[in-house]
């Protein structure tokens, strides 16, 4: 969940513009109800963790507006005023396969403040809002990316075209032209988001009537459109692959600027498929909510006045409450409005992308009404919980290792190819599940083995005294399927193959394995992390269930370890199938 620091001075400025007194203590007490967990409130500002579904609260302007409705009962129309503009944006058909969703808007006359500090605060707030939307709704610019430009520096109409890698322009904050290829390879933003341009040989750019590049989405803007402290007229472009995310991003940026007095104008979009339309749309979304659903979820019946008041605090409007005359004769889904039942027609702002079902409206009604005002009653739904079939086996394995003096650990399921295979000399037995856009080189795939995670743990604790004995029972992923494995590792002087065999034998005994069915087979040299002649496969009923042994010093050195280590790893799924539970 994104955590933001909202400056008291900006919030005070926004509330003063609307005749509302800003009280940070009131925010601390009441704002968590609408998805704003207050982490800190100091002299500079208020730090708030925003729930993932409330992306409409990521800027000073939008959260201040929501607070006015929720805390001060200020009523706003769910319809967003958008004036019809005459600027045209034409999208070339080649864009369809590259970045198919293109939306734009114009905002004029934004009040960015009087003093230099107020103007600087505005620019900083706008940039932070843009990046938070990239991170959340935009899914790191994959679903949607936003460009904000100084309109006065541009010459409409605009065109969205595709160019090759040799096309050049001056990117934001640079002094000389760079080609598309150079930007993707050497510019910080280019390197960060180059993966979004994989497997294409044409790249999207937005140009004005003089063929000057405004934007190379989703990477970077052109330098000549840079927004400054004196910018009052804006062009906003949003491009991506998910139309719902793109529309929400565009409306939320427009809303922030409109809250500062800006007038939003639509543009005429001539899309790649030949469709002509005006965007953005400011009209609200209409939802039908059965009265039965409200009563079922809240445990009480609310009258029309109470519903209207509650939804108003969440930015919506109750249009009417009526008896259904046309619809199904029986209820098949919770949200169905049956003939003869009462339903409520509710309008919500289009930028509330988190509202996808009538149950979301019921949640907003509950928040507006106040959870403290709802009746207390025990649930009438009785649910019996039973253990998973595998939980008994997992519990017995952990108990056995703990009884042997091995501390239980839990590590990340994420790992990397070098740790999983190259360092420990295990072959990639099954198809690996890799991360398409890894943040670090250490976490590029989902692990197939657990032992490398334990060796990394011992490496991180190598400065502590010996012995160190650890085990982990966890999830691995092979061929896109979750499986369970257990591994142990002991860093101790004098512990060798005999110690490893002792631990393995004790575990199998505790699980109820028949010793006559257990076979110990020598591991071939360099097949796994073991010293030659000191590694073994454990076979039950002809099936290999695990390997144990003494680690080759060369393998230990790869993990930064300089002490003798004995270890092993078992396939828990195989153990469960081959060793019957002696208790059952």
Predicted ranges, named:
Residues 2, 19, 33-36, 41-44, ...:
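Extended beta-strand-rich architecture
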Residues 4-15, 230:
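Generic N-terminal amphipathic, Lys/Arg-enriched alpha-helix
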Residues 22-24, 29-30:
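Short, surface-exposed alpha-helix to beta-strand junction/turn motifs within ectodomains of secreted
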Residues 47-49:
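Function-determining surface determinants
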